[in-house]
Amino acid sequence: MKVIFLKDVKGKGKKGETKNVADGYANNFLIKNGYAVEANNAALSTLSAQKKKEDKLAAEELAEAKALKEKMENLTVELKAKSGEGGRLFGSITSKQIAQALEKTHGIKIDKRKMDLPEAIRALGHTKVPVKLHHEVTATLDVHVSEE
């Protein structure tokens, strides 16, 4: 029997896939538990419409991420911190502080987990921070730490 998977089933298929499986397995397990539906014309047309909709949404998200990247590449986030001799900070600047400053000064809300800051900033000056906006788009944000 040909079925369309509604959920991922380990070893059998992923969501949205169309596959042939044994009739008993399809009727007694997959369809009964809501993991799949029988692949008839109506279900196939619904699946194709849903895939088109998902593709369109993914393209829109990618376009938004690219536009945000263009905007962020030209920005500088200014942060002030207390420092000692040689430009070393007392404490450090974290991705959370950068995200808050970005939202406060430029109105761009970015999740702190999207900032790829390997370790906190501990010195004065400019630092380039990569920000993963989308799995295909990474922007570079300029962070300037000056003395308070």
Curated annotation (Swiss-Prot):
Keywords: Ribonucleoprotein, Ribosomal protein, RNA-binding, rRNA-binding. InterPro entries: Ribosomal_bL9, Ribosomal_bL9/RNase_H1_N, Ribosomal_bL9_bac/chp, Ribosomal_bL9_C, Ribosomal_bL9_C_sf, Ribosomal_bL9_N, Ribosomal_bL9_N_sf. SUPFAM superfamilies: L9 N-domain-like, Ribosomal protein L9 C-domain. Pfam families: Ribosomal_L9_C, Ribosomal_L9_N. GO terms for molecular function: rRNA binding; structural constituent of ribosome. One of its GO terms (biological process) is translation. Disulfide bonds: none annotated. Gene3D superfamilies: Ribosomal protein L9, C-terminal domain, Ribosomal protein L9, N-terminal domain. The keyword Ribonucleoprotein applies. It comes from the Bacteria. GO terms for cellular component: ribonucleoprotein complex; ribosome. Belongs to the bacterial ribosomal protein bL9 family. Binds to the 23S rRNA. This is Large ribosomal subunit protein bL9. It comes from Listeria monocytogenes serotype 4a (strain HCC23). The lineage of its organism: Bacteria, Bacillati, Bacillota, Bacilli, Bacillales.
